[in-house]
Structures are given as structure tokens and as C-alpha cells.
Amino acid sequence: MQLMRFDKPIGTLLLLHPTLWALFAAAGGIPSSSILIIFILGVIVMRAAGCVINDYADRHIDGKVKRTSQRPLATGRVTTVEAKVLFFVLLIIAFLLDLSLNQYAFLLSFVAVALAVIYPFMKRFTHLPQVVLGMAFGWAIPMAYGAVIEDLPLTCWLLFLANILWTVAYDTQYAMVDRDDDLRIGVKSTAILFAQYDNKIIALLQFLSLILFILFGWLSEYHIGYFIVLALTSTLFIYQCWLTKQRVREQCFKAFLNNNYFGFGIFIAILVGIYGF
């Protein structure tokens, strides 16, 4: 359970939010119950698989980082063989779920698997693993559009890009928690790359994501209520900037967790934009 992070649902929620945005936006309302269930289960399964492969990739370095030192693979409570078996079982479950989708979405699902597999290893080669994470967490967006309308319109890609910017911002907040440990062991991240400009760049990424959310709503011809809810939701970014101002580990992690509310706020904005209430 701990290996799959079922005890820490924040990652699942941050993956679920953009999935729901896309499903409801593509359907112009409530999507079919079958597609909704498949995608929700897919989020849970792929999030679990992502955690397993991430811990497998980091098994030799997690023990050197305060926050991750008690993870199952780092402590030896789970063997590498057990982790690999669990990962492939989860992939099989995800594959069976994908078989229930149309061919358009099914083919897109292979990209999702590729992103989930390569992401954990990116921190060894680039300071931008958060960008790959943004693509991985956002790939459910084109998959949702493909499953609902078998097309990938401009609004789909605006939502996808907005999600990448948002993800890089919040995962940089997350990486700020581990920055000292990462510098010591040689792991790369945007928190290290941005250095003393971290808070300013996070604010810029958040601002740019809001611009894309505005364009998305405008092209979707949403009710003005969408923009009102978006404006209210954006105040969470101001709160997060205040939290991370002093770069205190606990406050940076608190800012990261706060993004769950932002994701939910965007979902509410889309509902209001569609239904006009």
C-alpha cells in the first residue's frame, strides 16, 4: 500500500483533476458513466504504477534523502523483484482498462505508459524532470478528448499546456523541500536550476498557466462564470507564493499540497462555464 502511495492521495488527486477537466470539457457536460469510471480507475492504477517505478528507480538514493528514507524499497521491506512484479501487474490492469476505450484513446495510452516509465530516470540527466512529469500527468487530457470526441482540438492542447506549466510550478515547490539533499547527492530538479529565482519563476509559470486557462475558456465560449471562478481560484497562487517566500521546507510542502484546491477550482470553473450557473 505504501509503495503505491495509497496512504498519500495527493498525487492521485493532482492527476485526477486534469483528467476530469478534459472529460467534462470534451463532453460539454457530464461524460458517459462508462468512460468516467474507466478514467477514474485508470488514474488510480497508473498513479500507483508510477509510484512503484519511481521508487524502483530511486531505490539507491531514497535512503539518502530525509523525506524518502523510509520508503519500502529504500528500507528493504519490499524487494526489487516484488516491485517489478507489482509494476507489471498494474500495467496489465491499465491495459485491460484501455481496451474498453475506442482505438483513438487506446493508441494514445501508449504515450502515457512511456512517459510514466521514463519520468523517474530524468532527474539523472536533466534539471527539467518536472516538465516530463507535467506531460505524464497531463497526458490524460488528450486521451480524454480522444475517448469522448475522437479529436484533439486546440482547446485540448491549451488545457494540456496549461497543466504542464501548473505541474512544473507545483512540483518545483515540492522539489524545494528536497533541494539541500538533492544537491548533496547530485539529483537534478527545477528547484536547483532556478536557484535564487525559484519563487519568481514559479510565479511566472503560474501566471502563464492562467493565461492559457483564460484562452481555453474563451475558445470554448464558456459562460462568464468560468472566468469569475478562475479569478477566485487564482488567488491560491498568491497564497502559495507567500508560503514559499522564506523557502522553509514545511511551508514549501504546504504550498505544494494547496494545489489540490487549485485543481478542484478549475474543475468547478469548467462546470460553471458549461452550465452557466
Curated annotation (Swiss-Prot):
<protein>
    <recommendedName>
        <fullName>4-hydroxybenzoate octaprenyltransferase</fullName>
        <ecNumber>2.5.1.39</ecNumber>
    </recommendedName>
</protein>
<dbReference type="GO" id="GO:0006744">
    <property type="term" value="P:ubiquinone biosynthetic process"/>
</dbReference>
<feature type="transmembrane region" description="Helical">
    <location>
        <begin position="255"/>
        <end position="275"/>
    </location>
</feature>
<dbReference type="InterPro" id="IPR039653">
    <property type="entry name" value="Prenyltransferase"/>
</dbReference>
<keyword id="KW-1133">Transmembrane helix</keyword>
<feature type="transmembrane region" description="Helical">
    <location>
        <begin position="152"/>
        <end position="172"/>
    </location>
</feature>
<dbReference type="GO" id="GO:0008412">
    <property type="term" value="F:4-hydroxybenzoate polyprenyltransferase activity"/>
</dbReference>
<feature type="transmembrane region" description="Helical">
    <location>
        <begin position="224"/>
        <end position="244"/>
    </location>
</feature>
<feature type="transmembrane region" description="Helical">
    <location>
        <begin position="81"/>
        <end position="101"/>
    </location>
</feature>
<keyword id="KW-0472">Membrane</keyword>
<keyword id="KW-0808">Transferase</keyword>
<feature type="transmembrane region" description="Helical">
    <location>
        <begin position="129"/>
        <end position="149"/>
    </location>
</feature>
<keyword id="KW-0812">Transmembrane</keyword>
<dbReference type="GO" id="GO:0005886">
    <property type="term" value="C:plasma membrane"/>
</dbReference>
<feature type="transmembrane region" description="Helical">
    <location>
        <begin position="201"/>
        <end position="221"/>
    </location>
</feature>
<keyword id="KW-0997">Cell inner membrane</keyword>
<dbReference type="InterPro" id="IPR000537">
    <property type="entry name" value="UbiA_prenyltransferase"/>
</dbReference>
<dbReference type="InterPro" id="IPR006370">
    <property type="entry name" value="HB_polyprenyltransferase-like"/>
</dbReference>
<dbReference type="InterPro" id="IPR044878">
    <property type="entry name" value="UbiA_sf"/>
</dbReference>
<keyword id="KW-1003">Cell membrane</keyword>
<comment type="similarity">
    <text>Belongs to the UbiA prenyltransferase family.</text>
</comment>
<feature type="transmembrane region" description="Helical">
    <location>
        <begin position="24"/>
        <end position="44"/>
    </location>
</feature>
<feature type="transmembrane region" description="Helical">
    <location>
        <begin position="102"/>
        <end position="122"/>
    </location>
</feature>
<dbReference type="Pfam" id="PF01040">
    <property type="entry name" value="UbiA"/>
</dbReference>
<comment type="function">
    <text>Catalyzes the prenylation of para-hydroxybenzoate (PHB) with an all-trans polyprenyl group. Mediates the second step in the final reaction sequence of ubiquinone-8 (UQ-8) biosynthesis, which is the condensation of the polyisoprenoid side chain with PHB, generating the first membrane-bound Q intermediate 3-octaprenyl-4-hydroxybenzoate.</text>
</comment>
<keyword id="KW-0460">Magnesium</keyword>
<keyword id="KW-0831">Ubiquinone biosynthesis</keyword>
<dbReference type="InterPro" id="IPR030470">
    <property type="entry name" value="UbiA_prenylTrfase_CS"/>
</dbReference>
<comment type="pathway">
    <text>Cofactor biosynthesis; ubiquinone biosynthesis.</text>
</comment>
